[in-house]
Amino acid sequence: MKLQPLADRILVKRLAEETKTKGGIIIPDTAKEKPAEGEIVAVGPGRNAEDGTKIALEVKVGDRVLFGKYSGTEVKIEGEEYLIMREDDVLGIVQ
Amino acid sequence: MKLQPLADRILVKRLAEETKTKGGIIIPDTAKEKPAEGEIVAVGPGRNAEDGTKIALEVKVGDRVLFGKYSGTEVKIEGEEYLIMREDDVLGIVQ
Amino acid sequence: MKLQPLADRILVKRLAEETKTKGGIIIPDTAKEKPAEGEIVAVGPGRNAEDGTKIALEVKVGDRVLFGKYSGTEVKIEGEEYLIMREDDVLGIVQ
Amino acid sequence: MKLQPLADRILVKRLAEETKTKGGIIIPDTAKEKPAEGEIVAVGPGRNAEDGTKIALEVKVGDRVLFGKYSGTEVKIEGEEYLIMREDDVLGIVQ
Amino acid sequence: MKLQPLADRILVKRLAEETKTKGGIIIPDTAKEKPAEGEIVAVGPGRNAEDGTKIALEVKVGDRVLFGKYSGTEVKIEGEEYLIMREDDVLGIVQ
Amino acid sequence: MKLQPLADRILVKRLAEETKTKGGIIIPDTAKEKPAEGEIVAVGPGRNAEDGTKIALEVKVGDRVLFGKYSGTEVKIEGEEYLIMREDDVLGIVQ
Amino acid sequence: MKLQPLADRILVKRLAEETKTKGGIIIPDTAKEKPAEGEIVAVGPGRNAEDGTKIALEVKVGDRVLFGKYSGTEVKIEGEEYLIMREDDVLGIVQ
């Protein structure tokens, strides 16, 4: 069982933000909004352009991404917590 | 008797949100807005693009979908409660 | 004598909302905004697309439609009350 | 001497709203915004589309129209009061 | 020496608004925003459409125009006061 | 050393606004926002249209321009103060 | 390890703003929002136009840029602080 996001939405598994992540990104502890890190587990088919064509996403399943701390909507699937957000909420891909 | 939604609207039968649903999705009990689950019972013919063509919906009758808890407008048809919402209010399809 | 709506506007005769309507739709009595039911008595020629072409309406004279309770502007024609609204205010067609 | 409206604007002579008009439209006396009735005395050449072409108006000089009570800007020409408004402020044509 | 307006801007010499103007327009003294009258002394080359082409102005130097009382920005050139405004602020041309 | 503005931005050297400028423009002393005068010292390559083409600027280096008093962002280059603003902030070219 | 920005975003290493920078730009100490200076260390593939094509960025890795003081989102990569922002936040390139 899985969840298929619509349009330009993606399903993200948030990574623990208390520790230094595998990717080596350390989230600074300041007053500004801080980005969070996660792994993409499902992607939508893409955004609909005005002329009806699909614009494919730049991100893909397996990408580790940074996104705004308060981006997306939380959902639990088979006991695991995920986030559904739009691709535009993704700041960058960790490589 | 039924209700035919216009444009990119869909008619959704909300599923009980107190229990673990058949699809296995458990809605987490947090302060953030939580998505609800439902089954699509009717879909509109699609959104009108700027050039007048129809952009068909991605969802179809029978799809089980997640949507924002406060999305849509309530309506009763022959004693049953439904929600009319836009396809864009749908976060993803449960598979 | 009649009133010809402009562009994507329609003229609607509101149906009594206190009782169960002929179409079998019962409006639930909740705190949320509730849709109202009416019959279309006149339609405009359609919305102007950016390139100047007309986009014809999906609804037609005689359709029974649901719309937001506070949609439209009231007007009296020969003693009868009507509502002028945009097609986008219509949630669905009762069939 | 006259006033030539620009783009999609029209010049309207408001009709007395206290009495039942010639067209038979009676404005209901409720708390909602009520439309007013007038006759078009001049029309602009049309709105400019994004590609520079003109989109001709649907209304023409002589049409009796309904419009929002607070639509338009008042102006006096040779002692007579008129309203300048956009065609989109017109709700419908009285026939 | 003169001022060349950019894009769809025009330079207007405001006419005295206390007296009945040559054009015969009398500004009514009500609480609503009242239009003012002026003569166009310079026009821009036109607005840039999305595809980069110019959309020429409808008004030209010498036109007497009505515009919203608070439209535009005041500027003095060689001791004379003018207004710089966008063509869209013009309500109509006095003929 | 210089600063190359991006897109439709320009770099402007503000002229003293206390005295009558060379161009003969006297800024009136009223409560309304008053335009300021400056000389363009650098221009960007132009705005990106929706289809990816560049829309060249109407102004060029050396033009004396009027702009809104609070337009732009201040920056110091080698001890001299400049303003970076968008071309749309320019009201007109002094000739 | 690095961070690949999405779409029209860029990754910027902020330069110390207390001293006169190498590029010779001195940030004035006024009440207005002051621009900051930085060096671009990574750029996204470009913004998606409405028709699905990419619009390449004007800036490139190595460019020294000015940007609004509060632009972008802070992130730490391997102990170093960076800013992720959109290209539109860049005011100009220091040359």
Curated annotation (Swiss-Prot), chains A, B, C, D, E, F, G:
Places the protein is found: Cytoplasm
One Gene Ontology biological process: chaperone cofactor-dependent protein refolding
CDD domains attached to this UniProt entry: cpn10
Domain of life of the source: Bacteria
Secretion signal span: none
Keywords, sorted A to Z: Chaperone, Cytoplasm
GO cellular component: cytoplasm
Cross-referenced InterPro entries: Chaperonin_GroES, Chaperonin_GroES_sf, Chaprnonin_Cpn10_CS, GroES-like_sf
One example GO MF annotation: ATP binding
Family matches, as Pfam families: Cpn10
PANTHER family noted in UniProt: 10 KDA HEAT SHOCK PROTEIN, CO-CHAPERONIN GROES
Subunit field text: Heptamer of 7 subunits arranged in a ring. Interacts with the chaperonin GroEL.
Family: Belongs to the GroES chaperonin family.
UniProt function note: Together with the chaperonin GroEL, plays an essential role in assisting protein folding. The GroEL-GroES system forms a nano-cage that allows encapsulation of the non-native substrate proteins and provides a physical environment optimized to promote and accelerate protein folding. GroES binds to the apical surface of the GroEL ring, thereby capping the opening of the GroEL channel.
Protein name: Co-chaperonin GroES
Upper taxonomic lineage: Bacteria, Pseudomonadati, Thermodesulfobacteriota, Desulfobacteria, Desulfobacterales
Gene: groES
